[in-house]
């Protein structure tokens, strides 16, 4: 699912590789909400479904663990920005929450692979090159989710989210260039999930790190 990309803007000397973490919300209890900031706890309370509450708690626990008490503000696109020099991004689907952490722009997306009409949906969100790739694919369902997660990770990395048209970016060859910035993408498989990570640096973690929060 789409969560906003979060950019931390304070100029701190940080030299770190991009890391990608995943956690299972079934290992989190509701009373962990007491560890969250008042703003995050209020957001948890606004969630109606139990699993949505747990996903929101997990996102807050990730931020606590890796960002400490960093101050978060929201820009004109609804993208949260933080003040300790790091960039991070959160995504969730099914029982899992994904957390990407870097010292440069980053976006991630996780989607549980489920049956759908990829061609019909693809016509709404994919550009011509992507539709050609999808139409020629042996595994159309898998290809749909590969393209979809790459596109969502890219848009989150760029900071535009879906305020711009999904067809305006082309992820068919695994990278995208705009305004003299190159965006690179890498894909990961995890159980029955498709995961994509996008970064302005072509230096990706080899593996996803599973973590119990």
Named regions from a protein language model:
Residues 6-213:
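Core catalytic alpha/beta fold that binds nucleotide/phospho-ligands
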């Amino acid at each position: 699912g789409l969560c906003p990309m979060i950019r931390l803007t304070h100029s701190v000397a940080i030299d770190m590789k991009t890391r990608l973490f995943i956690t299972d919300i079934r290992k989190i209890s509701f009373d962990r909400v007491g560890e969250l900031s008042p703003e995050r706890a209020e957001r948890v309370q606004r969630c109606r479904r139990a699993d949505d509450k747990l996903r929101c708690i997990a996102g807050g626990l990730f931020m606590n663990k890796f960002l400490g008490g960093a101050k978060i503000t929201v820009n004109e696109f609804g993208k949260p920005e933080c003040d300790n020099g790091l960039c991070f991004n959160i995504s969730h689907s099914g029982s899992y929450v994904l957390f990407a952490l870097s010292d440069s722009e980053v976006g991630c997306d996780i989607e549980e692979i489920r049956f759908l009409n990829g061609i019909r949906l693809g016509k709404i969100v994919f550009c011509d090159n992507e539709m050609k790739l999808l139409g020629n694919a042996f595994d159309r369902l898998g290809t749909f989710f590969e393209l979809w997660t790459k596109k969502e990770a890219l848009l989150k990395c760029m900071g535009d989210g879906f305020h711009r048209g999904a067809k305006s970016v082309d992820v068919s060859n695994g990278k995208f260039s705009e305004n003299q910035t190159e965006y690179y993408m890498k894909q990961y498989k995890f159980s029955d999930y498709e995961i994509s990570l996008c970064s302005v640096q072509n230096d990706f973690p080899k593996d996803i790190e599973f973590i119990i929060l």
